């Protein structure tokens, strides 16, 4: 299984999820590289399992002006995971079906409780028609080749 975090660059910048604690420095370095000096506006937290959320506090230390986007259950869990983290004035609580406009990208949040944990939500980017699926559709193991390589081979 691979654990991915994504950056959506538009008029506003959103980072989708964080990564496992074992990859903190590598991940923060890659995020900084992709941002190229820009500051993220939002950190979208779809799932609080540590392999997705372990670096929320580290991210907020690196980018303290970022707003965290999550649902009520996620924020409750976050407060228990990161007891010393102060998100006062930095929370954007979403309900099922809410949207967030980044510019041309519009994100829609869909709750998916018990896909894995009770707070899970997925995020649909209607511009690129991409579903950020948290732990949905996950599979352990790794492909020997990339998915795009497989699809290219199938269409020939």
Provide a role label for each language-model segment.
Residues 1-35, 122-125, 129-133:
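Conserved beta-strand hairpin/beta-sheet module of binuclear metal-dependent hydrolase folds
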Residues 11, 22-69:
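Active-site metal-binding motif and surrounding structural segment of the metallo-beta-lactamase
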Residues 11-13, 98, 105-107, 128, ...:
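Well-ordered beta-strand scaffold positions
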Residues 47-49, 123, 135:
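Divalent metal-coordination and catalytic microenvironments
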Residues 48-53, 76-77, 116-117, 138-141:
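Active-site environment of divalent metal-dependent phosphoester hydrolases
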Residues 70-120:
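Metallo-beta-lactamase
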Residues 131-147:
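Short, solvent-exposed beta-strand-terminating loops
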Residues 148-155:
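Conserved small/polar residues in nucleotide/adenosyl-binding loops
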């Amino acid at each position: 299984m691979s654990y991915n975090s994504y950056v959506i660059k538009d008029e506003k910048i959103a980072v989708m999820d964080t990564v496992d604690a074992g990859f903190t420095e590598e991940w923060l370095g890659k995020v900084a590289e992709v941002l190229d000096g820009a500051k993220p506006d939002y950190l979208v937290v779809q799932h609080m399992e540590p392999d997705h959320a372990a670096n929320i506090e580290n991210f907020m230390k690196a980018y303290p002006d970022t707003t965290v986007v999550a649902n009520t259950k996620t924020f409750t869990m976050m407060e228990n995971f990161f007891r010393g983290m102060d998100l006062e004035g930095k929370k954007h609580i979403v309900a099922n079906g809410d949207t967030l406009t980044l510019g041309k990208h519009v994100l829609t949040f869909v709750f998916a409780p018990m896909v894995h944990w009770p707070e899970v939500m997925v995020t649909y980017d209607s511009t690129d028609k991409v579903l950020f699926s948290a732990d949905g559709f996950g599979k352990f193991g790794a492909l020997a080749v990339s998915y795009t390589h497989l699809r290219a081979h199938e269409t020939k």
